[in-house]
Amino acid sequence: MTLRPSLLPLRLLLLLLLLLRGAVCQAEAGSETESPVRTLQVETLVEPPEPCAEPATFGDTLHIHYSGSLVDGRIFDTSLTRDPLVIELGQKQVIPGLEQSLLDMCVGEKRRVIIPSHLAYGKRGFPPSIPADAELHFDVELIALIRANYWQKLVKGILPLVGMAMVPALLGLIGYHLYRKASSPKISKNKLKEEKRNKSKKK
């Protein structure tokens, strides 16, 4: 059986379209699997050993063990070979994504965290261990938690506001002093000399 000459171009075109569609589908599937995460992802690996009455919140001091790795599995930092890391939540002592993942965590709990680059080191990276735009993976365990009391939280919350309020006041005082200095009448040198002469004559 032979194909009509008029049907050959049509069948070749259909075959090319099918091949092209398959290639596009494979490319889309590959891009979906390789695309970086856009939001913080938190997975609980180990639940706290007992009901958690005091989950971590801003102002608390946390003792954590962690291991940080890149997408390819290379570990760039770990605390497992040293003492736990001590941080105070809300003081920006670690990258934003890691700090956010520690909120509501309980002692004894272990989490796996996937942090997008904009919540880690962003475009600048942290050479040489962390490249630019790197997605980071952390395994974190909360070893101990020291609860901040009411007065500690109050002081830490008010002091920044007081500092912000004092800046305009100080600027206003400086501006007022400069204005008074500029608007005060200036005495010429000749007039000063005359006043000195008059004082000396009176003596």
UniProtKB/Swiss-Prot annotation:
It catalyses: [protein]-peptidylproline (omega=180) = [protein]-peptidylproline (omega=0). It comes from Bos taurus (Bovine). Residues 59-146 form the PPIase FKBP-type domain. One of its GO terms (biological process) is chaperone-mediated protein folding. PPIases accelerate the folding of proteins during protein synthesis. InterPro entries: FKBP2/11, PPIase_dom_sf, PPIase_FKBP_dom. This is Peptidyl-prolyl cis-trans isomerase FKBP11. Keywords: Isomerase, Membrane, Rotamase, Signal, Transmembrane, Transmembrane helix. Its EC number is 5.2.1.8. It is a single-pass membrane protein. GO terms for molecular function: peptidyl-prolyl cis-trans isomerase activity. SUPFAM superfamilies: FKBP-like (SSF54534). Belongs to the FKBP-type PPIase family. It is found in: Membrane. GO terms for cellular component: endoplasmic reticulum; membrane. The chain crosses the membrane at residues 158-178.
